Amino acid sequence: MGAGEERVGAMRDDADRRLGRRALLAGGAAAAVGTAVLARQELSRLWWRLPGVERPRVAGAVDFRGARWVAASAANYRRADRPDDYPVDRVVIHVTQGGYASAVKVFQDPSHEVAAHYIVRRDGRVTQLVRELDVAYHAGNRSYNERSVGIEHEGFVEDASSFTDAMYAASARLTAAICARYGMPVDREHVIGHVEVPGTDHTDPGPHWDWDRYVGLARRARESREKI
Ligand SMILES: [Zn+2]
């Protein structure tokens, strides 16, 4: 999990912040049509007309087939339009240091300012909490948050038995799908632990996480995806 970075976004009203971005971009369009003043609604309509700025979102939609959707608090991520605004070139592996339910509760609590895109349970069940379009606050490093997809794993860094076969298999399929989506190689340069994020004091996923096994599984999952 990450610390409470990017406090600025949380302190400001989301609608106002988004209007600021809309106004900035729609300003050019307004000048082009010769209109001096536009009402707020008109600004936002122009914004939606601009191509490629933001994809339509469907409530409850997930980026990984079979994932269950549980929304994180909007204070725990920043809306974005990845990979158009921020290229995605990392998967960051985390361990929750607690149970699944308590981790989900933290991600739904606006006071924590942390959330990952996904959490994988001991039984291999995958839950998505933040769309990959958006910047989740999981890495404790702004640029790594912007460039990565974060996957939490239920369990404890110091407890090797946390990491079950079902968890490895499901998470590896998820990582394979993410790497395929953004054209990333499945390797230890692109699939990293939270411990490897610059400046972090977090140690997850820790010494019991079997990287050779995980990357091997993810590579095989990627290859079988390509054969389909
Ligand atoms: Zn972490």
Task: Tell where the protein language model's regions lie, with residue ranges.
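Basic/polar, cationic surfaces and motifs that engage anionic cell-wall
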Residues: 2-19, 26, 39-71, 157-228
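Short coil-to-beta-strand
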Residues: 142-153
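Structured loop/turn residues at beta-strand edges in well-structured enzyme cores
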Residues: 86-87, 146, 186
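Extracytoplasmic/periplasmic, Sec-exported soluble proteins
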Residues: 85, 110, 139-143, 159-170
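Residues immediately flanking
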Residues: 95, 153, 195
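N-terminal catalytic cores of peptidoglycan-degrading enzymes
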Residues: 2-140
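Metal-dependent polysaccharide deacetylase catalytic core of the NodB/CE4 family, i.e.
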Residues: 136, 153-158
